[in-house]
Design a protein with these regions (language model features):
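A short, glycine/small-residue-rich beta-strand->loop->alpha-helix junction that serves as a flexible
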Residues: 5-18, 214
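Conserved nucleotide-sugar phosphate-binding/catalytic loop shared by glycosyltransferases and other
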Residues: 7-8, 26-76
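Donor nucleotide-activated moiety binding/catalytic core segment of transferases
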Residues: 77-80, 233-268
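A conserved, positively charged/aromatic
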Residues: 113, 126-137, 248
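C-terminal amphipathic helix plus adjacent low-complexity
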Residues: 311-350
Length: 350
């Protein structure tokens, strides 16, 4: 059995884990503070929260990221994980937690870390990445971090982007198919070609997530005012799109943050885009935006620009177009990740 730990910040980790889990042909057991997603294909253990406003030595003198002393929720969640690692789990995936990675490895269970962009060379990340049996990176080798240690690169499977709009490679009966064969869409998800009859207008679609942002309504209003002739539509978790796949294709340019899943959805739709990094630990979104801009895939920015910059940025996004998104994705990222996990489960190298 494969164990799969899912971090609770935002929903991106859970969405990605679900896409991968649905491609597995072996049992999978999820762990998270979050509730079980409706389409999770196996058992799910909901862990008690371990947050607190007044933690005592949560980093263990700088060795760990989060292990507060005397916290009953933290002790309970680690105990629940240890119980299943002892009895059921043969391979443990973490997306992502250095502490869970090290716990599994200390219990003699092979570990796989879902890698994240940004500077992960701090003491804690370095220990987790070094200790892991393998890493899975949801981006392409062509756009990989140039500063990663070679020992990480050697044990990394670069899957390309993993999007909920990717067609599943494993059909409902669990029978594998070649990635290029037609696929049956997941329930409630349109993974077809761009809708017929779509008329592209001078429009901007802003897609913003729930993971934390420094961009407010006033910033977007100022950008809108600075770009007459462009119609702006804003979608957030509080004002979701009724059909995001269609809206992505209807938009002339899409503006979004640098979160891994948001960018994966852009890549699936192959749309001209402006990706604006939001502050994240270890400069994760800065690294994503820089990689996109460096590869000439779309406009990647370090921060939300001034209103006067928006006309030029939108025109630059149109000039770049969406033709180079294939550098970022292969179209079967979840299947590639699942295949690597099953190979490791057999004791082989992917």
């Amino acid at each position: 059995m494969i164990g799969y730990y899912v971090h609770h910040h935002g929903l991106g980790h859970r969405n990605r884990a679900t896409q991968i889990a649905r491609e597995l042909s072996v049992p999978v057991l999820g762990f998270s503070t979050l509730e079980c997603p409706p389409d999770w294909p196996g058992e799910w253990v909901q862990l008690p929260p371990d947050t607190t406003d007044q933690p005592e030595d949560p980093t263990a003198n700088g060795v760990l990221h989060w292990a507060p002393l005397g916290h009953p929720g933290h002790r309970e969640r680690m105990g629940l994980l240890a119980d299943r690692l002892r009895t059921d789990v043969d391979l443990m995936v973490t997306d992502t937690s250095a502490e869970v990675t090290l716990l599994a490895r200390l219990m003699g269970v092979p570990t796989v870390v879902m890698a994240m962009r940004g500077d992960r060379t701090d003491r804690t990340h370095r220990a987790a990445y070094d200790a892991a049996t393998a890493l899975v990176a949801p981006w392409s080798a062509e756009t990989a971090e140039p500063y990663w240690p070679e020992e990480w690169n050697r044990k990394t499977t670069f899957t390309g982007a993993i999007s909920r709009f990717d067609a599943p490679v494993r059909d409902a009966a669990g029978v594998g198919r070649h990635p290029l064969q037609p696929a049956t869409p997941a329930s409630g998800t349109d993974v077809a070609e761009p809708p017929s009859g779509v008329v592209h207008r001078e429009s901007v679609l802003v897609v913003w997530g729930r993971g934390g942002t420094v961009v407010g309504d006033a910033d977007i209003a100022a950008a809108r005012a600075a770009t007459p002739g462009w119609r702006w539509t804003v979608r957030t978790p509080d004002a979701p799109s009724p059909d995001l796949w269609r809206e992505l294709h209807e938009a002339t340019v899409v503006v979004t943050h640098g979160g891994n899943n948001a960018v994966a959805e852009l890549s699936a739709a192959r749309v001209p885009a402006v990706v604006v990094a939001q502050p994240r630990p270890h400069d994760e979104q800065l690294a994503t935006a820089a990689a996109l801009d460096r590869a000439g895939i779309c406009v990647g920015l370090e921060h939300w620009p001034s209103p006067a910059d928006w006309p030029v940025l939108l025109e630059r996004a149109l000039t770049l177009g969406g033709q180079r998104w294939d550098v970022w994705r292969h179209g079967d990222g979840a299947h590639r990740a699942a295949a690597a996990l099953e190979t490791l489960l057999r004791g082989e190298r992917p």
